[in-house]
Amino acid sequence: MVRVDQNLFNEVMYLLDELSQDITVPKNVRKVAQDSKAKLSQENESLDLRCATVLSMLDEMANDPNVPAHGRTDLYTIISKLEALSKS
């Protein structure tokens, strides 16, 4: 992985960790953030596949009407960084 990619990967992992510990978002969002972090950590699959899987999981949560506005903003931030990571 190129250094820029590694920095972006670390940033995504940090944001997912922050989201998983945010008690102001519903429990299902925190669970998906934890699952997403675990999925991204599995190095036995290609990065593109891991990113696509996590993007799907996060997109489903972003469309949940029970997610507060700030939680949705966090999800969209992570989604955009993941899309950039998968294209690099």
Swiss-Prot record:
Signal peptide (residue range): none
Pfam families, per the entry: UPF0147 (PF03685)
S-S pairs: none
Source organism: Thermoplasma acidophilum (strain ATCC 25905 / DSM 1728 / JCM 9062 / NBRC 15155 / AMRC-C165)
Family: Belongs to the UPF0147 family.
Protein name in UniProt: UPF0147 protein Ta0600
NCBIfam families membership: PRK04330.1
